[in-house]
């Protein structure tokens, strides 16, 4: 059965992870520019700019009132078809960001070379560890003054616990940035700043000891490069494909996305080394990407911000087979067959109505409240894909009604929103409070506005004394009953009626874990 195999093998599905302001938006734009998906890249200077960099065509297409193209972008590069899944930045950081990482086969980690490894990057890397996702690293902003490159590699290795294999090495930085040397190819690529959509032709100098190099970058920088490379080649790791695929080693590239330099280097690495669509574990068996029959899982639901449209879009990662317009699929959780005739597909040429999609691709299903995160769709087989987690929230608020008579609608709304992954809801066992948990502040605002428009419920938040939450289980029924009896004031049920320990402080949580070694406290839970 060969028909989809060449299509499947061509695909590379990845996401970009970074701390806010490391340059992810610019890189996303430049990746599309190099992939010829957009003709102009309007980069953004300064926070006040209203042209907050959304590549031109992303804004164009508001199909049925929902702008979804920003979430998935597909473009051809080096005989591959690359799917880039956007992970929202700081304005709309949420659990969606974490879950998107469960739908990709590799990640590009972008680091601001002036700052090094930052907090959000650490969190996102923890999530990629759940599936040992292969990571490519791009040290960005070489056109500014940066930290010592060796120091940056050490920090990645020590903080993120992943070995670094430098592929390119910088020559100078800031105003003195002259380019990068490619260790494996023994070539120097000289930097000429390209801005916006101008990609400069790169001049290549072959050989580290070529006198042309000294002329091009100056004697001092050429000598500094040779000295540094002697150190680097002695102290750092060589690239190994196996270790990369296992998530143990990351190839490192240096460049400046703003200056259109170095982006093509990591894209070459991505298309050459990153895995094609991978197999996926389900509850009954492993599903291979080369299988003929269609299967896929929902990893994200995008709510519609336009009150005129009550529609939402469920994002599905195709795991195997081929999606064709009008095909009948089994919605496994509810046991119903559905005909999918209007799925949104994200193709390079026509992003609205492409007729087919293969393993590795992402399609959007119109969802009128029946689809939940983690749902599996198949061509008839009853199976459920695993590994689409709920994450313990980090921010909590108590939610209160302005009109106490609408308690029922409030609960219904919150449970539905939690099924959709917009927020998590906890109901303490000992009182009638409703506690809402999120990983990003914006999630709280979204919930209040959607409760109002979709459920006609006006709600407000109050502070609540909760630091963190963990799902709890215990194999020993007797010990679990004792734990529940003695900790009732800290226990709650989540939206799916799973028992949760609500801790007022981290110290409290640590003490509870010490006191009850037989009880397992989970930071993530399967959808």
From Swiss-Prot:
GTP binds at residues 18-25, 86-90, 140-143. Increases the formation of ribosomal termination complexes and stimulates activities of RF-1 and RF-2. It binds guanine nucleotides and has strong preference for UGA stop codons. It may interact directly with the ribosome. The stimulation of RF-1 and RF-2 is significantly reduced by GTP and GDP, but not by GMP. Belongs to the TRAFAC class translation factor GTPase superfamily. Classic translation factor GTPase family. PrfC subfamily. GO terms for biological process: regulation of translational termination. Pfam families: EF-G_D2 (PF22042), GTP_EFTU (PF00009), RF3_C (PF16658). This is Peptide chain release factor 3. One of its GO terms (molecular function) is translation release factor activity, codon nonspecific. It is found in: Cytoplasm. Its main location: cytoplasm. Residues 9-278 form the tr-type G domain. Keywords: Cytoplasm, GTP-binding, Nucleotide-binding, Protein biosynthesis. One of its GO terms (cellular component) is cytosol. InterPro entries: EF-G-like_DII, EFG_III/V, G_TR_CS, P-loop_NTPase, PrfC, RF3_C, RF3_dom_3_sf, RF3_GTP-bd.
